[in-house]
């Protein structure tokens, strides 16, 4: 399972800055589309081929009035699910009483804690860290979140115990499908409907938890693994069942999956939580199918309203198939696997370099790149750079000056001509290096001697 790293610390020590610095180290797999909502409290990141989830508890809050309420309930959920805790302190302010209280509170979690002394740029690191030795945390790191100093070595050390991510080696043939959605949208009902219709033998896979259950099954001689992120149900004081929604477990399921099935509730429309989940999936680059549940029984005007809202708010995810279903009664459920298979095969498809290069030439001839300083941007050739999502690498000159609008044009044209369905496409641009860049025009010794002879000859003629 992908590791989870939690950031904790008192306000204004730089948790959000470090979060942004770490999550920004991995380029987004797709363009930053207008209208795409991202939850900045949780994020995917990668360092040296090791993926992880990072949680910023800064937005969750720390109460510095009473020790008993030092951490909110949501903070404690995040810390309970974390594999590693990064405890941030301010190297310029020194040790405070709140820092001591937080350190005391962290001990009860029985987790690996790294003390991260931030804002040490321009300071002697040993002196900056010395003030915090009394906290009793052995792993101490000095960093500068704003300038990036020390972050690479910090990530290298905390990720060392975790293995490099290799999806291909974990499961050979089965298509992993993550069912993502808000509590009570019908994820478990849909999975039960699928399993009931197919009459398959279901067994629990080793290592599954109550929060995320993996269910393998076979349909039409194809193997699948359904990852249910429904969550833990607990009883409240008034004896009502309430579903505990874990963002972290959902993020882990999304990262493990080949295809994500986002379930929406037709009765409630598209909520902010739906948009946040969609943002996670888009950023992960996974293949996507959207299912609108509880479609049966709606009035026609309500259906039209939902379709209009989907078209307006999900325009940046127009690569995904949308299917209207009823998990309870089964209508539309059978067609989901057609969409899932299409999305999966599009995400893992391979294309030869000659084919991609010819397509690039045709696309750029149809709409030529703009000129920069009187010189036209040249797109020379393209090749495949990865799968799930498919990555196309384009080589050429002056690619740094290529406008975003032209990049979107290339993306849309490649998707259309390659017939990609249900998967985003990432395009990387690599410019050719000028071998004479930053080189001074230095004369050879022979040229120097010739120049001197000419100068002597010119003087003798005066």
Swiss-Prot record:
Species name for this entry? Legionella pneumophila subsp. pneumophila (strain Philadelphia 1 / ATCC 33152 / DSM 7513)
The protein's name is GTPase Der
Family matches, as Pfam families: KH_dom-like, MMR_HSR1
Q: Which HAMAP family match?
A: GTPase_Der
| The family this protein is said to belong to | Belongs to the TRAFAC class TrmE-Era-EngA-EngB-Septin-like GTPase superfamily. EngA (Der) GTPase family.
Underlying gene: der
Q: What is the purpose of this protein? A: GTPase that plays an essential role in the late steps of ribosome biogenesis.
Q: From the UniProt record, which GO molecular function terms apply? A: GTP binding; ribosome binding
* Database matches in PROSITE patterns: G_ENGA
Assembly and partners?
Associates with the 50S ribosomal subunit.
């Amino acid at each position: 399972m992908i590791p989870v790293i939690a950031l904790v610390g008192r306000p204004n020590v730089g948790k959000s800055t470090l979060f942004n610095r770490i999550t920004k180290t991995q380029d987004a797999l797709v363009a930053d589309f207008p209208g795409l909502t991202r939850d900045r409290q949780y994020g995917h990141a990668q360092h040296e081929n090791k993926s992880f989830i990072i949680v910023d508890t800064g937005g969750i809050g720390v109460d510095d009035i009473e020790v008993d309420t030092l951490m909110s309930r949501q903070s404690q959920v995040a810390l309970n699910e974390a594999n590693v805790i990064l405890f941030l302190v301010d190297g310029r302010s020194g040790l405070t009483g709140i820092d001591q209280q937080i350190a005391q509170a962290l001990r009860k979690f029985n987790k690996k804690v790294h003390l991260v002394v931030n804002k040490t740029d321009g300071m002697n690191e040993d002196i900056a860290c010395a003030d915090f030795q009394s906290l009793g945390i052995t792993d101490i790191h000095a960093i500068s979140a704003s300038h990036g100093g020390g972050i690479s070595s910090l990530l290298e050390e905390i990720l060392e115990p975790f293995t490099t991510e290799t999806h291909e080696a974990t499961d050979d043939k089965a298509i992993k499908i993550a069912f993502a959605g808000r509590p009570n949208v019908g994820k478990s009902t849909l999975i039960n409907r699928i399993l009931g219709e197919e009459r398959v033998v279901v067994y629990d896979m080793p290592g599954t938890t109550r929060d995320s259950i993996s269910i393998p099954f076979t349909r039409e001689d194809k193997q699948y693994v359904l990852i249910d992120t429904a969550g833990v149900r607990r009883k409240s004081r008034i004896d009502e069942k309430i579903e505990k929604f874990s963002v972290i477990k959902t993020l882990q399921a999304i990262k493990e999956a080949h295809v994500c099935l986002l379930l929406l509730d037709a009765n409630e429309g598209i909520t902010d939580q739906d948009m946040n989940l969609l943002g996670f999936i888009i950023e992960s680059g996974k293949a996507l199918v959207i299912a609108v549940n509880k479609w049966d029984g709606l009035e026609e005007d309500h259906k039209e309203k939902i379709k209009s809202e989907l078209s307006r708010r999900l325009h940046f995810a127009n690569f995904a198939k949308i299917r209207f279903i009823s998990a309870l009664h089964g209508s539309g459920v059978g067609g989901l696997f057609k969409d899932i298979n299409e999305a999966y095969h599009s995400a893992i498809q391979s294309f030869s370099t000659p084919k991609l290069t010819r397509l690039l030439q045709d696309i750029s001839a149809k709409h030529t790149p703009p000129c920069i300083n009187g010189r036209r941007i040249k797109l020379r050739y393209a090749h495949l750079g990865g799968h799930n999502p498919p990555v196309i690498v384009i080589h050429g000159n002056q690619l740094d000056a290529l406008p975003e609008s032209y990049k979107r044009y290339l993306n849309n044209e490649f998707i259309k001509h390659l017939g990609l369905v249900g998967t985003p496409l990432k395009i990387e641009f690599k410019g050719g290096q000028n071998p004479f860049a930053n080189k001074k025009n230095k004369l050879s010794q022979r040229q120097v001697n010739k120049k001197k002879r000419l100068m002597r000859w010119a003087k003798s003629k005066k």
